[in-house]
Amino acid sequence: MEHLILVGIGGAVGAMLRFELSKLRPVRSIPLGTALVNIIGSSLFGCVVFSRSPGDIFYLVDVGILGGFTTFSTFSFETFRMFEEQDYQTMVLNISINLIGSLIGVLLSFILVTLILTGG
């Protein structure tokens, strides 16, 4: 039950943060708010996992806050809208920014946490 409460509190915080960031205006038809929440969320998720944080931190931050903060469904919907509008160049750019940006964020979090934990 304790984990459920941590996830619920974290999820509410993450959803509110995402709501605020989603107000950012698109840049060249790219939904910047969605890309930012996914890249930032993936990076922070990696930091918590790679640092082997205690279970309560994992449930509160990764499952709760970052689960409520990141949004694959909005990314998918926005990308589909670009497809419907036959804006294929923007669609591919949006996919690339979200996926590659998120993967780079995880990689950088791995490098950062490894350097911190090894003192190097």
UniProtKB/Swiss-Prot annotation:
Cell membrane as UniProt keyword: yes
A GO cellular-component term linked to this record: plasma membrane
Catalytic activity: fluoride(in) = fluoride(out)
Transmembrane segments: 30-50, 57-77, 97-117
Keywords carried by this UniProt record: Cell membrane, Ion channel, Ion transport, Membrane, Metal-binding, Sodium, Transmembrane, Transmembrane helix, Transport
Bilayer topology annotation: Multi-pass membrane protein
Pfam families hit by this protein: CRCB (PF02537)
Cell compartments where the protein resides: Cell membrane
InterPro entries, alphabetized: FluC (IPR003691)
KW Membrane (keyword) present: yes
Gene Ontology molecular function: fluoride channel activity; metal ion binding
Highest taxon in the source lineage: Archaea
One GO term (biological process): cellular detoxification of fluoride
Residue sites binding Na(+) per the record: 67, 70
UniProt similarity note: Belongs to the fluoride channel Fluc/FEX (TC 1.A.43) family.
Biological function: Fluoride-specific ion channel. Important for reducing fluoride concentration in the cell, thus reducing its toxicity.
Annotated protein name in UniProt: Fluoride-specific ion channel FluC 2
Organism this protein belongs to: Methanospirillum hungatei JF-1 (strain ATCC 27890 / DSM 864 / NBRC 100397 / JF-1)
Higher taxonomy: Archaea, Methanobacteriati, Methanobacteriota, Stenosarchaea group, Methanomicrobia
Gene: fluC2
